């Protein structure tokens, strides 16, 4: 549903204050129209007469839905609508608690954590340790060994994918970082 009011304003989308309920309705609509056949919808934010999306999705019951966020509301949305959860900037000490909460919410929806594809977005800076806001080391930064250990921690928690990103805009440094990732770290995980 987003987290920056400036993005909502720039895109001239529905108001930022109601982004959660708007996103919930969009997810309901998306899942319904992907199923094929005519769909009508009557929600608080969206209403439409019978319409059909053609061709229907070949993925059943709908294409995968990866939902990001670490708040309780985001986790509820994952449990109700998602086929996967993407955590971003999640302190490793909070992973067990967030996974436990997500598991509880999944159970309320007749699901388990095993039903979800767990993904983490990790910003990398191999060879340069960077501080996090709490004064510790930011995950994904530091030596080859340290970053390798960070990735293994996510694997140990059941994550099946990690999306790597270099936070800078220097193309040469970005290429160097991903070469290091491919050559020095990926063979170890």
Predicted regions and their residues:
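Active-site-adjacent structural elements that line small-molecule/cofactor binding pockets in enzymes
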Residues: 1-189
